[in-house]
Amino acid sequence: MKTALTIAGSDSSGGAGIQADIKTMTANGVFATCAVTALTAQNTTGVTDILESTPHFLAEQLDAVFTDIVPDAVKIGMVSSAELIAVIAEKLRQYGAERVVVDPVMVATSGAKLLRDDAIQALTSQLLPLATVLTPNIPEAEILSDLPITDAAGMEAAARTISQRYGCAVLCKGGHQINDADDLLWRDGGGKWFRGRRIPNPNTHGTGCTLSSAIAANLAKGYDLDQSVERAKAYISGALAAMLDLGKGSGPMNHMFDLKGGFAE
């Protein structure tokens, strides 16, 4: 059985973070392992507290996974400090990690920055050059490219700039504010659009975590990047269309809507 590692924060509501990652990877037919960067006290209405992992303990978790259940792919999500980012980059290099998907969690839904300037510097200088593919939303792509994005042409310019800067593929997610659910994959000097329709579901907590984890799971199974993105988009559309309705705020998706179906293949 193929394996995938998620390096991210824990979400006590179960809709995002490692909880969403593990459910997504399982539903997509791979065995999931994890290294926790932070514990969060949160629910569908917001975050009330965060307890960050120490660099030493994060390193211990990564050593434990890489020396035993070696991952076929790695997904990296919420990492809130420069020190933790440095640990992750060091361990990825030490163990020769392959098929690395980075979801650069930098901006909250409200638009507020989630990373200090030193953490952004560590992310861009140490972690992004190790990535196979980045999955920024529009605000994150604007930060990484230093370009404004107001339309599809802006997405293309930003994705091209990010790819050239960090030497990796970039999946720029347009659903945040530009269009229905059309995402642009920029790789090897060219772009490819993956069309999608917006699902009329207000419960979208954890969509970024879920998409990046589904991509990692499919890369782990041997699908190429284009196929992995296409399959991941189909999976997340199905999870949203299942219309799970939990909590008082922006609730989670139904990650297990098709547990015995084709996504595990």
Show the residue positions of the predicted features.
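Conserved N-terminal subdomain of the carbohydrate kinase-like
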Residues: 3-6, 26-110
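Short pre-catalytic strand/loop immediately N-terminal to key active-site residues, enriched for Gly-Thr
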Residues: 7-13, 191-205
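N-terminal basic/disordered segments at the start of proteins
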Residues: 14-30
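Phosphate-handling active-site elements
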Residues: 29-33, 192, 218-232
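Charged C-terminal helix
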Residues: 49-52, 226-265
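Nucleotide and nucleotide-moiety/phosphate-recognizing core
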Residues: 86-95, 168, 182, 188-190, ...
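Conserved phosphate/ATP/ADP-binding segment of small-molecule kinases
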Residues: 117-191
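Short, small-residue alpha-helix embedded
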Residues: 142-143, 201-225
